């Protein structure tokens, strides 16, 4: 799948106006394309799409993300797409790490999955694996960094995820034990 993104500098007010117009994606159902808005996930509204074909695929996903933190905070994170129709929150796609102190314009041409029109399809876009080199960057994020769309009126609970921004020293502590285990097994061989 081709993913393009750019990060540009613009005044926050201008970006906010652009983003409030709504992020959209194009859903292909059978032979027809239909634009679907991405809604902040604290709104429980789901969008109903005319289900005329057997399978639904997604293409031409365009997302504009305004800076949520100061660029000086140095916060980065990956944008995940998850199917939340069950508690596992199956990963459908993940971008590379993005600087969340800048505007992000993300374009995804085609996603490598399809879903049956007979099933409910709640999809959530959200930032995960957030990292900051500064201690102040830990508590800067909330549910507002998630978007959702769905083909059902049912409400779904989001899978549990860690929303705290990880401090880089903490990240190193998490990685060190696995490196030690690997070195012990290497020495015993």
From Swiss-Prot:
One of its GO terms (biological process) is transport of virus in host, cell to cell. It comes from the Viruses. Phosphorylated. GO terms for cellular component: host cell membrane; membrane; viral capsid. Keywords: Host membrane, Host-virus interaction, Membrane, Phosphoprotein, RNA-binding, Transport, Viral movement protein. Transports viral genome to neighboring plant cells directly through plasmosdesmata, without any budding. The movement protein allows efficient cell to cell propagation, by bypassing the host cell wall barrier. Displays RNA-binding activity. Belongs to the tombusvirus/aureusvirus movement protein p22 family. This is Movement protein.
